[in-house]
Structure formats: C-alpha cells, structure tokens
Amino acid sequence: MSWRTSLCIGFVAMFMMACEPHVQPPTPPAPTANVPTFPGAQGGGMYATGGRGGLVYHVTSLSDDPNDSGSLRYILKTPGKKIVVFDVSGVIQLKRQLDITEGAVTIAGQTAPGDGICIAGHPVVIKASNVIIRFVRFRMGDEAGEEGDALTCTEKRDVMIDHCSFSWSTDECVSCYGNTNFTMQYCIVSESLRNSTHGKGRHGYGGIWGGKNATFHHNLLAHHDSRNPRFDHSYVDNKCFGPIDYVNNVVYNWGGNSTYGGEGAGQPRLINMVNNYYKPGPATSSSKKTRLLDPTVSCSSCSKLGTFFPGKFYLNGNHMHGSETVTNDNWKGSTVQTDEVKSLTPWTEGLTLMTQTQTAQEAYTTTLDKAGCSLVRDDVDKRIVDEVRNATYTYTGSNGSTKGLIDSQKDVGGWPQYNSTTPPTDTDKDGMPDEWETANGLNPNNVWDGKEYTLSQEYTNVEVYLNSLVQHLY
C-alpha cells in the first residue's frame, strides 16, 4: 500500500468519525433495590420501577387513534420500557376499552399543561406488571351502554396507582385485587352509577380491593351504594390471601353497605383495617350509620373453589363519625364479632409496612386536602371534597337514586372542560423542560441526560423533575 493510499484511508476514517452521530455512553445505573418509586410512595407497590431508565414518549394528541403516534393508545402499545409525559390537557374520549399490555411503564399525568388529563368513555384495564400511574382522572360514564369499571387491575405485580381520580363507572369505580406488591394511594373514588347500564341491575359500587402485600391508604370513597370497598373474595380470586393493609382511608355516604367481604377458599384472607375515617351521609340508612365492617361468613358460590373461610381482620384506631362507641371499640361496628373473624395483632409477615401513618382524624384532613388528581383539582373533585366536609350532597339520580347517589354522569353535568396551555419548551424531548435543565446544570440539547443520575443517587434526572412537580402533595 502506497503512502498516498494510506493517507487517503486515514482522512476517510477521520471524516466518518466526525460525521457519526454522537452517542452518549451509558451511565451505570444507580441501585434500584429498596428505592421507593418516588418520594412519598408507601406500601406494597412502593418499589415498582415502572419506566425508570426507559425512553420518554410525549402525548401530543387527545385522539384515541391507534395509528396516531402522539396518542396515548399508540404510545401504550409500543413495546419497551417507557415514561409517558403529556404536552396537552383535556378529555381523551376512548372509542373502546384501553388495555395497558406493556409493562415497565410510568404514566406521569402531572406533566399535562393546564388542567390535566381525563380518560372517559370506556374502561381502562391494566394487563401488565410493573406499572406506575400518577395524576390521571378516569371518569368512564355510561354513553357506551356497557358495564365496567373505570380502572381494573387484577393478578399483576408491582403496581403503583397514585393521586388519581375515579368516577361514573357502571360496575365498580376501581377494582384492584389478586395483585402482588400493590399500592393505591391518595386517590378519590366517587359517584359510581347506581341505576345505570349494568346487566344485573342496580349497582353503584366503590370497588373490590385486595391482593398479597397490597396497600390502600389515604383514599377517599364517596357516594357509593356499597363495596366501600369489598375485600378480595374467592369468587374473583383464589390466589392472594393477603396481607391487605387498609390504612388512613376516608369513607363517606355509603348506602346499602360500607366495607365488607374478605372471605377465602382454602384459607382465610388476612386484612388490617387501621386508622380509617368513616362518615355516614344523607344516603346512609339509620341502621347502617355505625357500620364499619360486614365480614362475609357464608358464601353460596365458594364450595366449588375450596373450603370456605371468613377473613381474619385486625381492627384498630378507626373513627366512626357520630359514634363514640364504635370509635372506642371498633368491633362494635362489625356485624360479626366472633373469634373466627378477629385478629388481636396486626398482620405483618410478608407485608411492606407503611413508613408513615396518621391517626384517623389526621388522615381525614390529609386525604381531603391532597387526594385525587390534585395538582389541579377539577370541579368534580372540588365538589366531592366539599360535600364530605359539610356532610351533604348536591345531586340526585335521574333513575330513582337519591341523596348523593347518582345514575348517570349527566345527573351532575357530565365531564368538565379541561383547559390546556402551551407546554414548556423541551428541545431534546427528554421529558425535562429546557429552563429546568439549565437551572439544574443539565444540557437541554442532550437527549440522554434524563436517564442519568446526576441530580440524585436514587432517581434518574427525569424522575427528579417529575417528582419535583408534585412533592408538596405528600
């Protein structure tokens, strides 16, 4: 090879290196074991990682078109670890049920500019594990004429539902049972539709809740006829028997029943009910005003699944508004008080214990102040919280329901208007606005620095940004 040929090859190689796109060398990830999903996460699902370290996808459209690359439906069906942020606020009217089939995903509703996101029209079903959903509204409605829950998650692992709002379902508002390592926290669950489109007739149910190492805390259930909540039962789940940690929740204006269930086939379910606040309302009959718990002690459909066992409940610190008797002795508020349903000590084995708990009275204040999609509360949640505080109601149903129990979303005026504003400039589309990156010493032209651990040893840079938007709500 001549010196001219060698020199030419050298110049070509140098040119190719100069023109090759810059690829950021991967940063060694920080340890994720025992790192909470975000500051303020507690309970069974508090170590879910979701889309940590994955690509950032921007929702730019409110359409439900599966071929629109900016739609939520399109993004959620895309394979791979991902964080979903929003460049728009408003109502996403689903054309059919939305299934979340790809796990390792974080849906960060707190990024929506303006009034936030509301998903309406059809149910949403979580069909994958390692899912994090924060600050999203699920207000289904009856326009499709179907029966369903606003959100369902069953038999999955490592799921965190945080600061979401649910209403106007035709079955249960939100049912999460049979899951392992699960948390639902700081959510508002309100106004399930009572005399609506369900094939079995009257419903109006809050939810079926349960699982194994499953935590439900600082949630508000308001204006449901029953299932406030209903704990796991063998008809729907014969795999997860607890422990279920039901702590610091608020229940208001139940109709036919408050909290019940808990039975299992083959063995009892283990349930802690600690420091919850129960407040009867106008729809609560006089015979149910002090009902804290109605354990299921018989089940006609359970024999085919295994020997029937009632749940074993640990009750402590629960407050029954208007009843000093039940507040001082929680078992006085149970329809069954026999030893077969009682536990004298809390269930802790296999349970990720909450790091911070409050008294029932403290939890009442915190939940009403901070629960739901509360970065910007919509008119629905504002009204619900006001009704709880003042022990009242505003609307009646159009098909026979009364005193705060409704039959259609039309009874309360339907979906609010959610205004959108211009999203902050994000030049490299890494989920962090340019202004925030510059203020924190990052490069607004480096698409890769969102995955790095420059600002925290526990959370990626983009997670630090997402968490900073809502840290005051914990």
Feature map (PLM): residue ranges:
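Bacterial Sec-dependent N-terminal signal peptides
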Residues: 3, 16-32
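Bacterial N-terminal signal peptides
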Residues: 6-16
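Extracellular beta-strand-rich solenoid/capping regions of secreted or surface-exposed proteins
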Residues: 71-80, 92-108, 117-134, 140-157, ...
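Right-handed parallel beta-helix
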Residues: 104, 109, 129-140, 155-168, ...
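Extracellular beta-strand/beta-solenoid scaffold signature
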Residues: 119-124, 144-152, 168-176, 197-211, ...
